[in-house]
C-alpha cells in the first residue's frame, strides 16, 4: 500500500476478531515505529502490553478510574455492575491493549512536551504500520491518563511518569466508514515577507 493510501484508508477500529497477532511481527512494527522523530534521540516511548487474563484486570482499573472521575452516567450499583460487565467484554474482545507512557524529565516543561510529541509520532507510525499489515487500532486518551490513582494502579508513579495513550490492537471485525476531513485551505495561511512586521497579537 502506498503511504497516501495507508493514511487515507486507516480507520479507528472498535470491533475486533479474537485472533492474536504474532508477537515477532508486533515487535517488528514497534522497531520500525521507533524511527519516529525524537529530539536528542531520547526515544522516550515506553509500552506496557496487556494480553490474555491481564486484559480483564487492566479493564477493571480503567473502569475504576472512570467511576472515580464520574465519567459513567450512572451511580446505581446494579447499573454500574452491568457497565462493568460490558467493559469487561470489550477489554476481552481486543487481543492487545497497549499503554504508552514516558518518563518525566522536567515536570511538564518543554522537554516533556517534546517527548510527548515524539511518543505521539511513534503511535501514529505504529497505527499506520499495523494498518499496512491488516491490523486495526484504536487510540484512546481520556482523563484517566491523568488520574494519579490509575497511574499507581498500573505500577507507575505520577511523579516520574506521564501516560500518553491506550491503544487497542487486533484484526478488525468491522471497518467503519471513513470520516471525511475538512479541506485544509481554511486552516492555513501563507505568510509573505511583507506581512511579517507588526504581527504580534494582542
Ligand atoms: C488523542 C486521541 C484520543 C482519542 N480518544 C478516543 C477515544 O477515547 N475513543 C475513541 O473511540 N476514539 C478515540 N480517538 C480516535 C478518534 O476518535 C478518531 O481518530 C477520529 O474519530 C477519526 O476517525 P478515524 O481514526 O477512523 O479516521 C482518539 C484519537 C486521538 C488522537
Sequence positions of predicted segments:
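C-terminal helix-cap and adjacent tail motif
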Residues: 5-12, 162-202
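Short, well-ordered beta-strand micro-motif
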Residues: 49-51, 99, 168
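Short, electropositive alpha-helical surface patch
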Residues: 150-162
